[in-house]
Amino acid sequence: MNVTIVDYNSGNISSVINSFKEVAKDKVNIEVTSDLNKIRSSDKVVLPGQGSFKSCVDALNAINGLVETLNEFTVTNKKPLLGICVGLQMFADLGYEETETKGLGWISGKVSKIDNQNNKFKLPHIGWNEINIVKESKIFEGIKNKSHMYFVHSYEFIPDDKSVISATTDYSSNIVCSVEKENIFGTQFHPEKSDKLGLKIIENFLNL
């Protein structure tokens, strides 16, 4: 099986690479690339994302044909894709970090700044927080409800269709921290920084 972690110059993704390689061992071939042909021929794709919504979208668009190839992989061919942090946020139609920016539009919705309730909640939201699993999800197999995952973000994805939400976390409000829509999976938290439970989520994705 071939799995591609998309490297589109969106910040340091070494921890994502290391975690996937640790779980994959020699059973899965992990490629780290933005090569369009390698993405097309992959069985699964991982879309990481660090930085702002706009900077990540701009970095994707800067590589000729990458967005079209990801659309073909995910929407047309319906192969499994996992978005992590801003990788998940880019599923949205629009993001409002820095300026209004068009997302990939795979899951209708928007990305807005977390309401800190007059500085009652610190932003960015950094650290371990409990997740509330709200529907059965393939990537949560073997993960207990109320498990703790690691977060670093100031913006939240608000999908129009609430049925895609697989988990939330309570920080200022019920923030979406995981989605599943057919072959599209996303986590707002960082599985690669979430210790053994995070590695289990990576394993579940690789086992799809």
UniProtKB/Swiss-Prot annotation:
Keyword Hydrolase tagged: yes
Subunit structure: Heterodimer of HisH and HisF.
Pfam families (UniProt xref): GATase
Catalytic activity, EC: 4.3.2.10, 3.5.1.2
Active-site residues, Swiss-Prot/TrEMBL: 85 (nucleophile), 190, 192
Functional description taken from the UniProt entry: IGPS catalyzes the conversion of PRFAR and glutamine to IGP, AICAR and glutamate. The HisH subunit catalyzes the hydrolysis of glutamine to glutamate and ammonia as part of the synthesis of IGP and AICAR. The resulting ammonia molecule is channeled to the active site of HisF.
GO cellular component: cytoplasm
Encoding gene (name): hisH
Name of the molecule in the record: Imidazole glycerol phosphate synthase subunit HisH
Native organism: Pelagibacter ubique (strain HTCC1062)
PANTHER family: IMIDAZOLE GLYCEROL PHOSPHATE SYNTHASE SUBUNIT HISH (PTHR42701:SF1)
This protein's UniProt keywords: Amino-acid biosynthesis, Cytoplasm, Glutamine amidotransferase, Histidine biosynthesis, Hydrolase, Lyase
Annotated pathway: Amino-acid biosynthesis; L-histidine biosynthesis; L-histidine from 5-phospho-alpha-D-ribose 1-diphosphate: step 5/9
UniProt key word Membrane: no
Disulphide linkage map: none
Reactions the enzyme catalyzes: 5-[(5-phospho-1-deoxy-D-ribulos-1-ylimino)methylamino]-1-(5-phospho-beta-D-ribosyl)imidazole-4-carboxamide + L-glutamine = D-erythro-1-(imidazol-4-yl)glycerol 3-phosphate + 5-amino-1-(5-phospho-beta-D-ribosyl)imidazole-4-carboxamide + L-glutamate + H(+); L-glutamine + H2O = L-glutamate + NH4(+)
UniProt cross-references to Gene3D superfamilies, sorted A to Z: 3.40.50.880
Domain spans labelled Glutamine amidotransferase type-1: 2-208
Lineage: Bacteria, Pseudomonadati, Pseudomonadota, Alphaproteobacteria, Candidatus Pelagibacterales
